[in-house]
Amino acid sequence: PLLTDASFSEDFAASVFLVLMLFGIVGRIFSGKLGDIIGALPTYILMSIGQTITVLGFPYIDFKIGLFIIAAAFGFTYSGVMSAILVCARMMVSAKLAGRAMALGSFFGWVGMGLGGYFGGLLFDIKGDYTWSFQFASLMGSVNLLILWQFHLRIKAKQEVIA
């Protein structure tokens, strides 16, 4: 709705969404490879940073090439986040609990996306534009990053004690 409300055609809006989804495929593959190199949690953090930053750009970019670029960047990092959640769950729990951990990670990821859409729509209804909705999404991404960073510090501290 953001693009059609901004007077772009439905065909153009669908093209932007297609680019977002195609780069999501690339991001999923890339994040898997990156996770092999730097680890699952650092990959999750990097992809979350990208998603948190790029989501802010959508309501401010009003030219076609810019929308394709921001859609590509967001799709790339968004899908990297989703795959990194599952890899983190698998890497950080025993094999006995892996299925449950991945299911819970997926569940809360989907609940978060659903609530994000709900609150984004609610903010649009209250404010009458998309700016607050996308800022809220970025704020929630920042909260996620704070949690991930605390998790990272905790793991690092435990590794230092063991070493």
Model segments located where?
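Helix-to-loop junctions at the C-terminal end of transmembrane segments
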Residues: G27-G39, F124-D125
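C-terminal ends and interior cores of transmembrane alpha-helices
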Residues: G50-D62
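Residue-level signature of mid-helix packing/kink "hotspots" within the transmembrane helices
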Residues: M21-I29, W110-G114
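Helix-loop junctions at membrane interfaces in 12-TM secondary transporters
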Residues: Y60-I70
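Short amphipathic helix-loop junctions that connect adjacent transmembrane helices
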Residues: P1-D11
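Intracellular juxtamembrane helix-capping segments at the cytosolic ends
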Residues: G80-V93
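A late C-terminal transmembrane helix in Major Facilitator Superfamily
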Residues: R90-D129, A137
